Regions:
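Extracytoplasmic gate region of multi-pass secondary transporters
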Residues: 218-260
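Structural signature of the two symmetry-related core transmembrane helices
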Residues: 74-88, 286-301
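Helix-loop-helix hairpin linking two adjacent transmembrane segments in secondary transporters
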Residues: 141-187
Length: 407
């Protein structure tokens, strides 16, 4: 990789880090928010949902537009909107106190709209810049920073919430707005070359249709796998946070430390796998995704019978290990499935299904408190196993990833 790209890659790594704070930093604080705003577990889970659904809706439009005008022109205002939404949520909490819940929901929607133009465009830009087998390493690095954000955010959220439960909302603005300006001033992008490659709208969608016609089953399987990984991870973490508070009476900061264990394992796995895939990409990629999906299922199944803290943490860590194996494999597969002219939209469609997984995970897993764990946990595990089998038979990385990236 060219040395002049190092600052760009460093800034791009900050984008998934800040984006993942959007949900992960709130997870250990949800029980406290529940108490302060007098809402139930399912309701408080909607703080995650109303952030993730707008992000998921915006992502494909942001991707399509970025294919035509450039990635930075979307990422910069998106990061500003993301930060402003967080600042508004904190201000509403101060102004309206125990009646602030609907106002915070509105601010989270604004924040989600901003989030829709961040991480996936960072992935697409990394894919534009790295035209060699180093792409898997760089994408693994981005996913590792995404994972690092998931590790740091429960600890940061728990620590900052010791000041007040609404203080984590202000962190979004303090971090996202400066990072937005770094993207604008530091990140390099060949917009002139991108504009030369811009196609008329009918040809753009025609070429996109050809991609899905030739690789549709494989891409659909990859999209499903990404949705399941994030659905299971965020669903389990939000449920585990509630269990730690109510069943084990663990205070907010130690709770953040415990929740950080599975996501630390996920981040380390993503980074190591991204590095290893450089040497034997097509062989390792497929088996990493399949085994990762089976590990997701194993973590969910094991979480049900365990009653002690160690057992539950081990089960959650197995799920984290599986997520860390699945996501970098999917990132490389999907960013390499389309040429530069359509990469933004294809990558962002993948981001949409990831966000929908995050959106529905916490409220659906929250229902386990009212009914019981096995129906939700075992059903999700079964779908993960099915996705693993589909990936095994329907996805051939050699047919999807260009030869110059494989070698």
């Amino acid at each position: 990789m060219k040395k002049n790209l190092y600052p760009t890659i460093a800034i791009l790594c900050l984008v998934p880090f800040i984006m993942v704070l959007g949900n992960s930093m709130l997870i250990p604080v949800l029980p406290k928010i529940q108490e302060e705003l007098h809402v139930g577990l399912v309701q408080v889970g909607f703080l995650i949902t109303v952030f993730s659904i707008p992000a998921g809706i915006v992502i494909p439009f942001a991707g399509m537009l970025s294919d035509r005008i450039g990635r930075k022109k979307i990422m910069f205002p998106a990061l500003l909107i993301y930060g402003i939404g967080g600042l508004l949520a904190g201000l509403f909490a101060i102004l309206f106190k125990e009646k602030a819940f609907p106002w915070i929901i509105g601010a989270r929607i604004i924040q989600g709209i901003g989030a829709g133009g961040t991480y996936q465009l960072g992935m697409a830009l990394a894919g534009d810049l790295i035209q060699s087998n180093e792409r898997s390493k760089v994408l693994g690095l981005l996913e590792a920073f995404n994972g690092l954000g998931k590790v740091v955010s429960p600890l940061a959220g728990a620590a900052i919430a010791l000041i007040s439960w609404y203080m984590p909302f202000f962190v979004y603005g303090v971090l996202a707005i400066p990072i937005g300006f770094l993207v604008l001033w530091v990140v390099s992008e060949d917009v002139k070359k991108l504009k030369q490659q811009v196609q008329p709208i009918p040809k753009y969608f025609g070429d996109l249709a050809k991609i899905f016609k030739s690789k549709g089953l494989a891409l659909a399987t990859a999209f499903l796998s990404g949705l399941l990984a994030l659905f299971a991870l965020f669903g389990l973490l939000s449920f585990f946070s509630d269990v730690l508070e109510k069943q084990f009476k663990i205070s907010i900061f130690p709770r953040g430390l415990i929740l950080g264990i599975p996501v630390l394992i996920m981040a380390l796995t993503a980074y190591i796998l991204g590095t290893v895939m450089q040497k034997q990409m097509t062989r390792i990629l497929k088996w990493a995704a399949v085994i990762g999906l089976f590990m997701l299922a194993a973590g969910l199944i094991l979480f049900c019978p365990f009653k002690n803290l160690w057992g539950l943490t081990i089960a959650a860590s197995i799920l984290g290990l599986g997520t860390g194996a699945v996501l970098p494999s999917l990132n490389t597969l999907i960013t390499s499935s389309a040429p530069k002219t359509e990469r933004g939209l294809v990558t962002c469609l993948y981001g949409t299904v990831r966000f929908f997984g995050v959106a529905i995970g916490p409220p659906l897993f929250g229902l386990a408190e009212k009914i019981s764990k096995p129906p939700i946990f075992f059903t999700t595990a079964g779908i993960c196993i099915l996705a693993g089998v589909l990936f095994l038979f329907l996805v051939d990385p050699k047919k999807i990833i260009p030869k110059e990236i494989q070698s």
